[in-house]
UniProtKB/Swiss-Prot annotation:
Residues 1-11, 87-94, 171-182, 262-269, 328-335, 401-406, 479-516 are mitochondrial matrix. Fe(II)-heme a binds at residues 61, 378. It catalyses: 4 Fe(II)-[cytochrome c] + O2 + 8 H(+)(in) = 4 Fe(III)-[cytochrome c] + 2 H2O + 4 H(+)(out). GO terms for molecular function: cytochrome-c oxidase activity; heme binding; metal ion binding. Its cofactor is heme; Cu cation. This is Cytochrome c oxidase subunit 1. Component of the cytochrome c oxidase, the last enzyme in the mitochondrial electron transport chain which drives oxidative phosphorylation. The respiratory chain contains 3 multisubunit complexes succinate dehydrogenase (complex II, CII), ubiquinol-cytochrome c oxidoreductase (cytochrome b-c1 complex, complex III, CIII) and cytochrome c oxidase (complex IV, CIV), that cooperate to transfer electrons derived from NADH and succinate to molecular oxygen, creating an electrochemical gradient over the inner membrane that drives transmembrane transport and the ATP synthase. It comes from Balaenoptera musculus (Blue whale). Pathway: Energy metabolism; oxidative phosphorylation. It is a multi-pass membrane protein.
Amino acid sequence: MFMNRWLFSTNHKDIGTLYLLFGAWAGMVGTGLSLLIRAELGQPGTLIGDDQVYNVLVTAHAFVMIFFMVMPIMIGGFGNWLVPLMIGAPDMAFPRMNNMSFWLLPPSFLLLMASSMIEAGAGTGWTVYPPLAGNLAHAGASVDLTIFSLHLAGVSSILGAINFITTIINMKPPAMTQYQTPLFVWSVLVTAVLLLLSLPVLAAGITMLLTDRNLNTTFFDPAGGGDPILYQHLFWFFGHPEVYILILPGFGMISHIVTYYSGKKEPFGYMGMIWAMVSIGFLGFIVWAHHMFTVGMDVDTRAYFTSATMIIAIPTGVKVFSWLATLHGGNIKWSPALMWALGFIFLFTVGGLTGIVLANSSLDIVLHDTYYVVAHFHYVLSMGAVFAIMGGFVHWFPLFSGYTLNTTWAKIHFLIMFVGVNLTFFPQHFLGLSGMPRRYSDYPDAYTTWNTISSMGSFISLTAVMLMIFIIWEAFTSKREVLAVDLTYTNLEWLNGCPPPYHTFEEPAFVNPKWS
């Protein structure tokens, strides 16, 4: 019975739960790695002592957080749980493929961990650039294992993307048009399309790297007529859409949370929100070389990538101001979930502003590979994606479990986390502007103060993570059941009780829209 339910599951709720648990567990590993990094940088001099080991930590931290924490939780966890409920579908379109998408991840994770523990580990950074990732600078099987790990995670995501696209387009009730689906469903749809178009390019790039390393090809080796810059183009053509994949489902969740706790029945500017997400998805594919301003591109190429990158600020601004407009004039309920959403809106915007700074190719020449870039993407990930995940979790936890969290503890958790992440990443802007480079385990004494403060902040965040574990334990042991939910047209996932029955719809859902 246990095996049939949890190993061979074809139920979107159970698979979503597996994704959430796996992502939470991987998040602990990723947090542990980040704390080792910050412990090393807490003061000048060496702690771990070995720069290769330090770089392995940095690389593993990135891969674990991206492929095994944010993506499984947002797309696999929240996506699986909520998309079928929100569109009134009995399950996902391909329930068994759904199960395979999940079970490809633990082996992938195992391969990544193995790559760190054999030979010298893969100390390449998450970008895995050759020639550093070639078989000379990284002899041994570490990088090969990392490549195989990425292949498995990539196949998992591609299959999941196919599943979500088919489900969303094909499994709505007859009377429901695409423009009547909730914004979270739209965000998952756009994310799935991005995954489907970008991951094959990554697969091509790392497969060529694999053959360069093992089969004597020279795709990225100038000695044989190859070009390492080609790898950078292939990687970033995936890598830039990837960062939008990480944030788009968060946009969808924030839209729902803000609408719900403002007491509104729908978000402000529904069509504009959709247009903004689709635009961000499209533009995300034509700006990749802004990661490569320092490799020596033509001035007109740099001008194009600078302006194209800045254009993304427009649809992003549409979303931010629509969230503020949704809040405006609402009967605001100060729940923990809304606090996460407000924190998201503010801090994501700060991260976006530093992004506009980095979009300028001339400025980026100076700031590239400094801590300014680290601060920028951690503001949009550690305070964008993670805040959205936390907000979505405290908002939908009663739906998933049937129990309510202790609101006071949840608010305290938010405050500790808020202080922790800001204390960790705000000082890194100063370090970057002073020219401290990324991916080094030691630094001149001049950078000591801000690094020490940054490391203190990371330990505050650790306290918040431990408190979160306690809060979840407290909810499951106290067993406060859900009393009532505010139902509106945009809240259909709550319609079937908390938690919903194992099989939501035994027959097709009947939808009678207000307009058609």
